[in-house]
Amino acid sequence: MIITDPVGNPIATQTSMRGFGALSSKVRGLRVIACAAQVMAWVAHGKLSGYYSYDLNAWDVAAGALLIEEAGGQVTDMNSVPFTLRTRDMLCSQGGNVHRDILSTLASVDALTYEEESCQLPDFLNLRRTKLEVDAPPKSYWYDSRGQN
C-alpha cells in the first residue's frame, strides 16, 4: 500500500494526484492521509510499502525519517538524494526495489517535482514555494508595532 498527502499547495496537489493515478494500477492499495509523521511510522513498522509527498517541512518529517532509516527503510528526495532536514519533496519506503519502482512510476508521469507555472490559478492568488499569499486586506486592517494603524 502506498500513501500520499496532497498538501495545501494546489500545484503540488495536482502533481501528487498525477502520481496517485500512475501508481493505482501497480499497487494493491492507495490512500490519502494528511499526517506525515503517522504515515512514516507505519512505513517504518512495515504496515505500508511507501509514502510520498511534496513541500514538507522538517518538523513534519524528521522523527518519521529517523524511524524509517533505523528500521532499514529508505528516505530520499525525488532524485534519490538521502534525506536531510532541508528535503521538501520526499519518498519514504521499505527500501530496495520498492523505492526504485515508485520513483520510476512517478517519473513516468512527470510527478517527481512540481512546477508552479503549470497550474492555472485565480488571479488573486500569488503562489510561492513556501507559502500561499493572498492580496493584502485594506490598510485599515494593518497595525504598526504599537497597535495603531
Describe the function of each predicted region.
Residues M1-N149:
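An extended, acidic
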